[in-house]
């Protein structure tokens, strides 16, 4: 078979300096368009890619990014940054409304009649792209390939889901409020745990019954 079409195993190997990030950056820089579907996006995850995203904006390379409100994990500031790029369209699949989880991690890159796509375990977070134990597969296909047709079909289905998928301007303020409420709750829980740890645990002797004068 053609070596260019052989699947590749994409993972982080800190000892050898291998990172999932490098594979994604490489494909972004060579593509004519891209589509990304991930559950989680953080500021630290997109920061190393901002120079690349800005370069794609300058070249008018269109991109679509689909994420979710799952667990209120994605950072609104990261979403704001992506949405500010004129070449990127950002949408959010609302799992709270749909009543199901959303764990896709897929990166699709189109170059002429060829598609390269990375599918596996990596979200757009710093740890996933650089440090975590992650397993991904990179596949190369023509547009007619059965696998890419299935992937593209599922992406389009989720992207165009009218009931649960919202564009940036329609979801961001509501999501930002949900995210901030969750952050506040987590902060309160952490503070309560800290206080609980500081409280002295009474010794067993404190609970030992002492005989009164009549019992002596």
Region roles according to the model:
Residues 216:
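Pre-Walker A adenine-sensing motif
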Residues 1-213:
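PLD/PLD-like phosphodiesterase catalytic module centered on the HKD motif
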